[in-house]
Amino acid sequence: MTIKKIAVLTSGGDSQGMNAAVRAVVRSGLFYGLEVYGIQRGYQGLLNDDIFSMDLRSVGDIIQRGGTVLQSARCKEFMTPEGQQKGADILRKRGIDGLVVIGGDGSYHGANKLSKLGINTMALPGTIDNDISYTDFTIGFDTSVSIVVDAINKLRDTMSSHERSSIVEVMGRHCGDIALYAGLASGAETIIVPEVPFDMDEIAERMKQNFAHGKRHSIVVVAEGAGNGENVAKQLVERCETLEPRVTVLGHIQRGGTPTPADRNLASRLGDFAVRMLIAGESAKACGIISNELVLTDIDKVVNSKKEFNMELYELAARLSQ
């Protein structure tokens, strides 16, 4: 089948670099002579037929912007077979031959459903959590880690002044990669993630020893999926009242801001790759990057698997924090 018209949407939680990916899809599509359409507000916009033509001007000056110019939304209706069929019918009525979906796990499930209804689909990993399997990194992850590291640097300054410990809660319900990479990069004394069991007695004892040996601060980075920051602080105080931990929940600040060059480049490569693969006749595929090489994986395979945690990196962080 010859691809003539493609559409792009962003779905689920936004991530820095989504705009760079949209830009790449549009510019690459136009370069290859395709008609390119944008879908506003993800799958909700698809069901509302909120679809518009995109040209070079529509993606001008967006590569450096956070968020998503196409906007995003949750859509309960699309989770139903009737909603999925409606979405596929709208795309066919519009004559759209291919769809590029940018988002996380839920977005991949949606793309997978559409592919089973005969829509040519490509999925790009747009999520700060870095929890998509079959790709080393997701769009937005590098920027989020940079934001967390910057926050920890600032917290370390003030904690050192008062000889206190700091509990930094970061995003990551099921995947602790933000905590892991930011913790390692910032020299955190403790990293708590959902993938690795932890002993609060050991953590409290190590923190006490650090202060006893002259350390002026202690940083604990905890992924939200491993435990509430306030709860971690409470447990530490129960074991040692002198620790005086202060809790900082970084929240949605981790999703905003200008994407790093790494995220812009990753998004640009993946967006262009998705278009070229659609033209080549591929469908129902997830685009990713492994060892700096662009790869295609069946969406079916991705949505039914869990990303492997990098224990080697976790053990390195533990060794360096002694």
Swiss-Prot record:
Residues annotated for substrate binding in this entry: T127, I128, D129, R164, M171, G172, R173, E224, R246, H252, I253, Q254, R255
Q: Name one GO molecular function term.
A: fructose-6-phosphate binding
Mind telling me which InterPro entries this protein's record contains?
ATP_PFK, ATP_PFK_prok-type, PFKA_ATP_prok, Phosphofructokinase_CS, Phosphofructokinase_dom, PKF_sf
Transmembrane helix as UniProt keyword = no
User: Which major enzyme category is it?
Assistant: transferase
**Cofactor(s) needed:** Mg(2+)
Q: GO CC terms for this protein?
A: 6-phosphofructokinase complex
- What are its E.C. numbers? 2.7.1.11
Which Gene3D superfamilies has this protein been placed in?
3.40.50.450, Phosphofructokinase domain (3.40.50.460)
Q: Where in the cell is it found?
A: Cytoplasm
Any one Gene Ontology BP term: fructose 6-phosphate metabolic process
Question: Which NCBIfam families does UniProt cross-reference here?
Answer: PFKA_ATP, PRK03202.1
Q: Which HAMAP family match?
A: Phosphofructokinase_I_B1
Function of the molecule: Catalyzes the phosphorylation of D-fructose 6-phosphate to fructose 1,6-bisphosphate by ATP, the first committing step of glycolysis.
The protein's name is ATP-dependent 6-phosphofructokinase
